[in-house]
Amino acid sequence: MAHYFVGDIQGCYSELQLLLQKVAFNPSKDQLWAVGDLVARGTESLATLRFFQSLQDSAKVVLGNHDLHLLALHGKLKRPHPQDHLDELLNAPDIDNLVNWLRQQPLVRTLPEHNIIMTHAGVPPQWDIAILEHEAEQVSFALQQDDYLSALIAQMYTEDAEHWSPSLHGIDRLRYCINALTRMRFLHLDGRLDFKCKLPPSEQHSTELRPWFEFASKTAPQNTLIFGHWAALMGQTGNPHVVALDTGCCWGEHLTLWHLEKNEIITQKRLI
């Protein structure tokens, strides 16, 4: 079995298929792990979701911020962003089925035999793996309830939940988990999430901010952390235990696949 980890696809389905052809991906024996943001800025979000759903157990997906935003759009809680290309998906006859499939996907996946942890944006450095899995499970539980739109999705859009504390409870605790696992890039020196700066670290000159993966971590280096979300990194973290896979395919760059067993990076340039 080969394990392939792919960066943010964002509806770039054709590029994904070309990438999988390069490695002769075989869903009968291989697994495709996706760091989230399956949908949005590319033009083939519907095909992307249908493909991952069709893979069944051969696909291991975590939710990204754009995937969660799709739930809000489907629930009529938000209006589509002009840069998104989601009309085909939102009007598809199987949209309810696809949304329900997304709701079953977690915020974190682990591959214990290889000491791998995968989330969309990263792992808060103050969380160990037990806290990470517990907090993510609480969000997954809320997503799978009948009232998920009013109880969670409608209330997740805030930047107030920026600081972790074990004393957080209810929606505030869920918000922090969503923000940390799907939106995190830089942290303030006291550990607070920063939601504004999207630059690469080399272009960010504030002494008050550092990339989340430069803080002392309770999950690395004993584990390898796989994430996407931060396209400006272009795959560069300076840490072999922190693997960044978003390389901006939807922005005209390329889609990146990591073959775990060979420790090999394979890329596919954006077609359009």
Curated annotation (Swiss-Prot):
Record's keyword terms, sorted: Hydrolase
User: Is Amino-acid biosynthesis a UniProt keyword of this protein?
Assistant: no
**Short name of one Pfam family for this protein?**
Metallophos
User: Which chemical reaction does it catalyze?
Assistant: P(1),P(4)-bis(5'-adenosyl) tetraphosphate + H2O = 2 ADP + 2 H(+)
Which SUPFAM superfamilies is this protein grouped with? Metallo-dependent phosphatases
MF terms in GO: bis(5'-nucleosyl)-tetraphosphatase (symmetrical) activity
- EC class, as a word, reads hydrolase
What does the UniProt record say this protein does? Hydrolyzes diadenosine 5',5'''-P1,P4-tetraphosphate to yield ADP.
Q: What is this protein called?
A: Bis(5'-nucleosyl)-tetraphosphatase, symmetrical
Native organism is: Shewanella frigidimarina (strain NCIMB 400)
